[in-house]
Amino acid sequence: AAASLAATERWLASAHFAHTKPILTPRFVPSCSDALLQGLGELAARRGLPVQSHLSENLGEIALVQSLCPQTDFYAEAYDRCGLLSQPCIMAHCVHCPPEEQDLLQARGVFIAHSPLSNSNLSSGVAPVSAYLARGLRVGLGSDLAAGETENLFRVMAEAIRASKLRWRLLDDTTAPLTVAQA
């Protein structure tokens, strides 16, 4: 953790950001030690840097985080206890967020990057985006090229609508599918 944090500090000190701003990106909780996550939270607070990572993408990942962080009630708490939800923060996926996790995301002002193509390609599930929007969570679109297949946000938007229709028809008919304006 110390070496990674020191390298990040050196890079931040040596780089010039006239047209860009750095964002701290811990891959996800299972790939980072507690010390690294804590250090990144402190670095984000000290330098006012935003944070982005993955959250509640699939059920296997959620179970792994629970086994690694038994002191937490849900995945987002692992980030929050390290101060990583306090800065401007984007969490990708958020497919399986329980209501308590949604409450925390809303309280911290976290942005959700909905990546429907990636979620579909990895069989992660269908995020309840309409329900997130209805409760006031901030949601945007993500292309996630690691598992998505395009940077074309119009295709991502169409897939977000399509996925919400499948969720509405097959999983939860209490929340209407996304409209074009919502997507």
Task: Give the ranges of each region predicted by the language model.
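Metal-coordinating catalytic core of metallo-dependent amide/deamination hydrolases
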Residues: 1-95, 100
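Short, acidic/turn-prone active-site loops that include or flank metal/cofactor-
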Residues: 57, 116-120, 145-147
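Histidine/acidic-residue-rich catalytic or RNA/ligand-binding cores of hydrolases
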Residues: 59-72, 101-106, 123-132, 149-165, ...
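His/Asp/Glu-enriched, well-ordered alpha-helical/loop segment
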Residues: 81-88, 130-183
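Long hydrophobic segments that form regular secondary structure
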Residues: 97-110, 115-121
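Short strand-loop junctions, especially beta-strand C-caps/beta-turns
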Residues: 27, 94, 115-117, 142-144
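Glycine-enriched alpha-helix->loop->beta-strand junction motifs that scaffold or abut catalytic
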Residues: 41-50, 84-87, 104-113, 134-139, ...
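Divalent metal-coordination and catalytic microenvironments
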Residues: 24, 54, 91, 105, ...
